[in-house]
């Protein structure tokens, strides 16, 4: 999974560098009456060149140290090494939902849950990809009964469709034991959804907030049953440390932070900042959800986690060409990357010692690690919940519940 943070050494001041580039090329942007069009063309060309230069520098300063760091971590082990998928308990009778379950970590999460007996709703936008994933799962795991794998249509970028997915699920099952908020988009250009939300924040955070909110009655009803073990697991990333330093989640505009000045919204720097901010939101969401569940005495566990630096096509796409081989040489495969999710969702010790684990951030199976200081800010967590609720209610989608 993309990290968005230099692994070592002094930080590269991208924002000041970007500003200096803008000032430098501003010399070309004040046209005279005689030759305004050529200078305007030159200014646009110079701006694109400057953005590209910053992107190359950003990739060099970020991904090479990242590869070295991950190699060291791979040699020393990820997590504390005493838990693996062989310790997943029997899950017969349980029902799970995994968003983005058709590929990557989500695919292997679905596989392991179903292999242990759970009925799994594979939540994904594309019907063809979801059904192809289910077909492949059954071919690779013939012992999984067909009825254990069900496609749940879900487009996290659309509030109306998220609510539809929740209603669809609640019409099909009377319990929900495990909700894995796994789906997400990698660093992305600055575009808006039909609801008016910035795409990265919409998919990675807002859509999952709405899905969880809509499913809370079902989760609580399951948690009220004797012997239940209900968990909500939200995938974040070490990239959360690359969040926007100026975003404190105090206004609705903070959900639409471009993380760059005009003309720079699609630079790798801005894309990375938006991604990091959305991953910060994942941790704050999980923390605040736990606080609210404790306040209500609901008995639901909420955890967030960093699955590690995972080898995916998306991870390669966000890197400069020169550093893309690092993905295939040093990153963890998605099957192994699902171990942290499975620990959080199923490990017996998490329920048996719930006070130790609930609301925490995991950095490997069985490994609690403090996230960034802002991700531990309880006030920011409450603020984020409140502005997200206001933004979602403003779309009118919740009226369909």
Swiss-Prot record:
Known pathway: Secondary metabolite biosynthesis; terpenoid biosynthesis
Superkingdom: Eukaryota
Gene Ontology cellular component terms for the protein in this record: membrane
UniProt-listed PANTHER family: PHOSPHATIDYLINOSITOL-GLYCAN BIOSYNTHESIS CLASS F PROTEIN, PHOSPHATIDYLINOSITOL-GLYCAN BIOSYNTHESIS CLASS F PROTEIN-RELATED
Record gene name: dpchH
Bilayer topology: Single-pass membrane protein
Protein's name in the database: Short chain dehydrogenase/reductase dpchH
Glycosylation positions in this chain: 16, 242, 386
EC number assigned by the record: 1.1.1.-
Pfam families reported for this sequence: adh_short (PF00106)
Transmembrane segments: 51-71
Gene3D superfamilies, A to Z: NAD(P)-binding Rossmann-like Domain
Entry keywords, A to Z: Glycoprotein, Membrane, NAD, Oxidoreductase, Transmembrane, Transmembrane helix
Subcellular location, record wording: Membrane
Protein task: Short chain dehydrogenase/reductase; part of the gene cluster that mediates the biosynthesis of the diterpenoid pyrones higginsianins A and B. The first step of the pathway is the synthesis of the alpha-pyrone moiety by the polyketide synthase dpchA via condensation of one acetyl-CoA starter unit with 3 malonyl-CoA units and 2 methylations. The alpha-pyrone is then combined with geranylgeranyl pyrophosphate (GGPP) formed by the GGPP synthase dpchD through the action of the prenyltransferase dpchC to yield a linear alpha-pyrone diterpenoid.
Keyword presence, Transcription: no
Molecular function terms from GO: oxidoreductase activity
Active site per database record: 275
Biotechnology: Diterpenoid pyrones display various biological activities and higginsianin A shows anti-HIV activity.
Class of the enzyme per the UniProt entry, highest EC level: oxidoreductase
Alphabetized InterPro entries for the sequence: NAD(P)-bd_dom_sf, SDR_fam
Biological process, per Gene Ontology: terpenoid biosynthetic process
């Amino acid at each position: 999974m993309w990290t968005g943070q230099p692994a070592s050494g002094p930080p590269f001041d991208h924002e000041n560098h970007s500003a200096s580039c803008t000032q430098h090329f501003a010399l070309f942007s004040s046209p005279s009456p005689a030759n305004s069009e050529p200078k305007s063309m030159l200014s646009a060309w110079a701006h694109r060149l400057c953005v590209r230069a910053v992107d190359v520098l950003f990739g060099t300063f970020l991904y090479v140290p990242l590869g070295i760091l991950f190699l060291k971590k791979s040699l020393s082990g990820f997590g504390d090494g005493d838990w693996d998928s062989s310790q997943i308990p029997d899950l017969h009778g349980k029902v799970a939902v995994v968003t983005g379950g058709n590929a990557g970590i989500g695919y292997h999460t679905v596989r392991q849950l179903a292999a242990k007996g759970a009925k799994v709703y594979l939540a994904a936008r594309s019907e063809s990809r979801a059904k192809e994933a289910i077909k492949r799962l059954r071919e690779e795991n013939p012992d999984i009964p067909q009825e254990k794998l069900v496609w749940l249509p879900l487009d996290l970028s659309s509030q109306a469709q998220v609510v539809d997915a929740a209603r669809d699920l609640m019409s099909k099952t009377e319990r929900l034991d495990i909700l894995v908020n796994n789906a997400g988009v990698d660093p992305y250009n600055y575009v808006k959804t039909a609801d008016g939300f910035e795409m990265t924040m919409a998919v990675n955070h807002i859509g999952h907030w709405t899905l969880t909110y809509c499913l809370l009655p079902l989760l609580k009803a399951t948690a009220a049953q004797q012997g239940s073990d209900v968990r909500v697991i939200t995938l974040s990333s070490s990239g959360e440390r690359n969040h926007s330093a100026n975003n404190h989640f105090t206004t609705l505009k903070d959900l639409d932070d471009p993380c760059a000045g005009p003309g720079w919204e699609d630079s790798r720097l801005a894309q990375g900042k938006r991604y990091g901010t959305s991953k910060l939101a994942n941790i704050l969401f999980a923390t605040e959800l736990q606080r609210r569940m404790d306040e209500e005495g609901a008995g639901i566990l909420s955890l967030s986690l960093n699955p590690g630096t995972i080898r995916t096509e998306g991870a390669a796409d966000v890197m400069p060409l020169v550093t893309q081989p690092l993905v295939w040489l040093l990153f963890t495969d998605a099957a192994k990357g699902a171990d942290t999710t499975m620990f959080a969702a199923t490990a017996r010790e998490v329920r048996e010692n719930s006070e130790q684990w609930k609301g925490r951030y995991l950095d490997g199976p069985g490994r609690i690690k403090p996230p960034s200081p802002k991700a531990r800010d309880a006030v920011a967590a409450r603020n984020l919940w409140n502005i997200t609720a206001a933004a979602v209610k403003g779309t009118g989608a919740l009226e369909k519940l």
